[in-house]
Amino acid sequence: MLEKSLATLFALLILATLINRFLLWRLPERKGGEVTLRIRTWWGIVICFSMVISGPRWMTLTFFALISFLALKEYCTLISVHFPRWLYWGIPLNYLLIGFNCFELFLLFIPLAGFLILATGQVLVGDPSGFLHTVSAIFWGWIMTVFALSHAAWLLMLPTTNIQGGALLVLFLLALTESNDIAQYLWGKSCGRRKVVPKVSPGKTLEGLMGGVITIMIASLIIGPLLTPLNTLQALLAGLLIGISGFCGDVVMSAIKRDIGVKDSGKLLPGHGGLLDRIDSLIFTAPVFFYFIRYCCY
């Protein structure tokens, strides 16, 4: 099933590439440079992800740890506070807890270490100016890029009935999360009228949100029972939760960027911006979907 699912992703990418080339041929005046760049980046993302998700579990965990590291590093370039380098060691420790299936320690490690060690460490520096801003900014970045994001990796550790079960759960989550972004964008562009958060993200509309959520619920209803142990009702609810939480992750990251005064979080992914621009929705959907499916099925 994993091989067929990945083959479907490649088929969709081929279709998108052909449609884009056809439109560029038929409408030469159309500016399709950004779309072409985005599709090329998607090719790189899907090829890399396919290799990792098809490999051994340690490889997938290492990949997620690398994503957390790059995301945290990118976040550090955005905020105007000094980020202690020793905090980066929390990333391999966090993913080691996942690899050894230490769920209780995982729940405590990042939140408790951030609450106690981070705050105490800043006090020992000796300068209390900007203490609250510094600690909260660092802690929020650590929670987002390491703790929340690593819940996607935890899906690999759930006691599934077959060896590919965890990988299929990750694929299901990522496919719906990214499709949700695309669906909400397309619905918003086609029939969006009422803005949801105009001061944060003017392009987000109520019609785009509702259309995207309904689309993802239908997609989840179709592929959920195939890739996951969810039944029909649970698959619908999973689609609803992913659709709404993905929107929340998107606008929260937009609020952070607006507060800092930047449009994109970086330039790591051509046509997409930074890594945080690509995984902002996943930061929220990963923990929501993990606890939902763990409660419902495990």
From Swiss-Prot:
Keyword Cell membrane carried by entry: yes
Gene Ontology cellular-component annotations: plasma membrane
Keyword annotations of the record: Cell membrane, Membrane, Transferase, Transmembrane, Transmembrane helix
Record's subcellular location: Cell membrane
Lineage top rank: taxon: Bacteria
InterPro entries with a match to the protein in the record: PC_trans
One Pfam entry name: CTP_transf_1
Main location: membrane
Membrane topology qualifier: Multi-pass membrane protein
Transmembrane segments: 5-25, 52-72, 105-125, 138-158, 163-183, 208-228, 236-256, 273-293
One term of GO molecular function: transferase activity, transferring phosphorus-containing groups
GO BP, sorted A to Z: peptidoglycan-based cell wall biogenesis
Family annotation (PANTHER family): PHOSPHATIDATE CYTIDYLYLTRANSFERASE
Homology family: Belongs to the CDS family.
Protein name, entry field: Uncharacterized protein YnbB
